[in-house]
């Protein structure tokens, strides 16, 4: 049996300050896992005025439209003001 290839996608997510970054990460992790994606790690970068940018490292099956699906999950979360895909790479 051939294993399906996976991708690593790095997203930059800006939080609007209405929830803490810890709470945002918990929600992001849960929503991604519910859709079959995995949050592998993240970096937190305070920008100022209560705005925080999160650089999320997410793995998912390599499928057509998968990055759009991940973006949709992230954009629908409370406290997220913007989502930007920075990079996609095949990981296996």
UniProtKB/Swiss-Prot annotation:
Q: Does the keyword Protein biosynthesis apply?
A: yes
* The entry's keywords: Elongation factor, Protein biosynthesis
Question: Annotated Gene Ontology MF terms?
Answer: translation elongation factor activity
Task: Summarize the protein's role.
Answer: Promotes the exchange of GDP for GTP in EF-1-alpha/GDP, thus allowing the regeneration of EF-1-alpha/GTP that could then be used to form the ternary complex EF-1-alpha/GTP/AAtRNA.
Q: What is this protein called?
A: Elongation factor 1-beta
**Family affiliation:** Belongs to the EF-1-beta/EF-1-delta family.
A matching Pfam family: EF1_GNE
The record's section on InterPro entries has: eEF-1beta-like_sf, EF1B_bsu/dsu_GNE, Transl_elong_EF1B/ribsomal_bS6, Transl_elong_EF1B_B_arc
Among its keywords, does the record have Phosphoprotein? Answer: no
């Amino acid at each position: 049996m051939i294993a399906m290839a996976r991708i690593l996608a790095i997203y930059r997510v800006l939080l609007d300050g209405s929830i803490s970054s810890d709470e945002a990460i918990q929600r992001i992790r849960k929503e991604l896992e519910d859709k079959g994606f995995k949050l592998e790690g993240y970096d937190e970068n305070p920008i100022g005025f209560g705005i925080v940018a999160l650089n999320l490292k997410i793995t998912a099956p390599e499928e057509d439209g998968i990055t759009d699906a991940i973006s949709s999950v992230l954009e629908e979360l409370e406290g997220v003001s913007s989502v930007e895909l920075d990079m996609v790479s095949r990981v296996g």
